C-alpha cells in the first residue's frame, strides 16, 4: 500500500491553504489527505483560479495515490469570514485543532506521516493560548523527545538547542541534553532513513571549537566527554569541529548528518544551499512529522506568487521516512 500522508492546512490567512490547493495539481505516489476547512480550500482555489474537486473523507479512509485536480479533505471548521492576509485570533483554536487531530490520527495508525503547513505563532499567543511551535505542541500530544532537523540539497542539520536566546545557549549545552539529542539523531537516522551506522559531524560551541580551551571550555567539559562515551557505544561521531570549516564540501561528503549547537550556527548554511526546498523534520517522536521551512507569507496569500518546492520536498521526505527507502523528487 502506498504511504498515507496527512497534511494540515496551517494558518487560514496565510499561504497554507494556497499550498494545499496548488499541491493538488501534482501527482504523487502516495495518498494525501488534507486536514482543514473545505469551504476555505474551495474559496482559495477559486481565488487562485485552480480547478479542483474536493472529496470529503473520514479519518483513516484509504485514498488513492494523489491525482491532479483532486483533493481529499478531512473536514475541520474554522471561524467564518477569513480573508487572505488578515489574521484573526478567533482562528487560533481551529489551527491548533488541525494539528492536534493530525497528531492523534497518526498516533492511532490511521496515517503514516504528518506534514504541516506554516502557522502564525503570534496570533495564537494573542488568543491567550501559550504556543511555542509545532514541535513542542505535537510532542505534548504524542510524547517522545523531539529533536529538530532540517534537510536540503543532500545534507541534514540537527540542532542541540532550538529557539533560545544566544545568551542562554551555553548553559543549555549539558551532558544530559547532548547525550539525549545525539541518541535520538543516531536512532532515527537508522530507523527512519535506513542508515546502518550513520556518520555524524558535531560542531563545537565556541569559535575554533574552543581553541584548546582558550576561547571557551564547553568543548572540553561537555562535548568531548559525551562524544567519547557514545563512540564506545558504537556511534560514528566526529568532532567537536569548528563550524566555520565543518561545512566545507570535503567534510560534508563524509557525513550523513551534522549536529549544530544552536539555531544560527547551522541553519544559515543549509538555507543558503537550498532554501526553497528545505524541510523541517521532527525526530524523536512516535510518529513521522515533516514541515515546510518557511512562514505564513501573509502578503502572498491568495496571490499565487508562491513557491511550493518546500512542501513538495516535505511530502517526498515523509514518503521516504514512511517507506524506509528514497523517494524521487516530484
UniProtKB/Swiss-Prot annotation:
The gene is pdxA. It is an enzyme of class 1 (oxidoreductase). This is 4-hydroxythreonine-4-phosphate dehydrogenase. Its EC number is 1.1.1.262. It is found in: Cytoplasm. Pathway: Cofactor biosynthesis; pyridoxine 5'-phosphate biosynthesis; pyridoxine 5'-phosphate from D-erythrose 4-phosphate: step 4/5. Homodimer. GO terms for molecular function: 4-hydroxythreonine-4-phosphate dehydrogenase activity; cobalt ion binding; magnesium ion binding; NAD binding; zinc ion binding. The active site is located at the dimer interface. A divalent metal cation binds at residues 163, 208, 263. Its cofactor is Zn(2+); Mg(2+); Co(2+). It holds the Pfam family PdxA. InterPro entries: PdxA, PdxA_fam. Keywords: Cobalt, Cytoplasm, Magnesium, Metal-binding, NAD, NADP, Oxidoreductase, Pyridoxine biosynthesis, Zinc. One of its GO terms (biological process) is pyridoxal phosphate biosynthetic process. It catalyses: 4-(phosphooxy)-L-threonine + NAD(+) = 3-amino-2-oxopropyl phosphate + CO2 + NADH. Belongs to the PdxA family. GO terms for cellular component: cytoplasm. Catalyzes the NAD(P)-dependent oxidation of 4-(phosphooxy)-L-threonine (HTP) into 2-amino-3-oxo-4-(phosphooxy)butyric acid which spontaneously decarboxylates to form 3-amino-2-oxopropyl phosphate (AHAP). NCBIfam families: pdxA (TIGR00557). Binds 1 divalent metal cation per subunit. Can use ions such as Zn(2+), Mg(2+) or Co(2+). Substrate binds at residues 134-135, 271, 280, 289.
Amino acid at each position: 500500500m502506498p504511504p498515507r500522508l496527512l497534511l494540515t492546512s496551517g494558518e487560514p490567512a496565510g499561504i497554507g491553504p494556497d499550498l494545499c490547493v496548488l499541491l493538488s495539481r501534482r501527482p504523487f505516489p502516495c495518498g494525501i489527505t488534507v486536514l482543514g476547512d473545505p469551504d476555505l480550500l474551495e474559496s482559495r482555489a477559486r481565488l487562485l483560479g485552480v480547478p479542483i474537486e474536493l472529496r470529503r473523507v473520514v479519518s483513516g479512509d484509504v485514498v488513492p495515490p494523489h491525482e491532479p485536480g483532486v483533493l481529499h479533505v478531512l473536514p475541520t471548521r474554522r471561524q467564518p469570514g477569513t480573508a487572505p492576509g488578515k489574521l484573526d485570533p478567533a482562528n487560533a483554536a481551529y489551527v491548533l485543532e488541525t494539528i492536534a487531530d493530525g497528531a492523534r490520527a497518526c498516533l492511532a495508525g490511521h496515517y503514516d506521516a504528518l506534514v504541516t503547513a506554516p502557522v502564525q505563532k503570534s496570533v495564537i499567543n494573542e488568543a491567550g493560548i501559550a504556543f511555542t511551535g509545532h514541535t513542542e505542541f505535537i510532542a505534548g500530544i504524542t510524547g517522545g523527545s523531539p529533536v529538530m532537523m532540517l534537510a536540503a540539497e543532500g545534507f541534514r542539520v540537527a540542532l542541540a538547542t532550538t529557539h533560545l536566546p544566544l545568551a542562554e545557549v551555553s548553559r543549555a549545552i549539558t551532558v544530559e541534553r547532548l547525550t539525549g539529542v545525539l541518541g535520538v539523531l543516531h536512532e532515527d537516522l537508522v530507523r527512519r532513513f535506513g542508515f546502518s551506522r550513520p556518520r555524524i559531524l558535531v560542531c563545537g560551541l565556541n569559535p575554533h571549537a574552543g581553541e584548546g580551551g582558550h576561547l571557551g571550555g564547553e568543548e572540553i567539559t561537555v562535548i568531548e566527554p559525551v562524544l567519547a562515551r557514545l563512540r564506545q557505544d558504537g556511534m560514528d561521531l566526529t568532532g567537536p569541529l569548528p563550524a566555520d570549516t565543518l561545512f566545507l564540501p570535503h567534510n560534508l561528503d563524509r557525513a550523513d548528518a551534522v549536529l549544530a549547537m544552536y539555531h544560527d550556527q547551522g541553519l544559515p548554511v543549509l538555507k543558503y544551499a537550498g532554501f526553497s526546498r528545505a524541510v523541517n523534520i521532527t525526530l524523536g517522536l512516535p510518529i513521522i512529522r515533516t514541515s515546510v521551512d518557511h512562514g505564513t507569507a501573509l502578503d502572498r496569500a491568495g496571490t499565487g506568487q508562491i513557491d511550493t518546492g518546500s512542501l513538495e520536498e516535505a511530502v517526498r521526505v515523509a514518503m521516504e521516512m514512511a517507506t524506509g527507502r528514497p523517494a524521487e523528487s516530484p
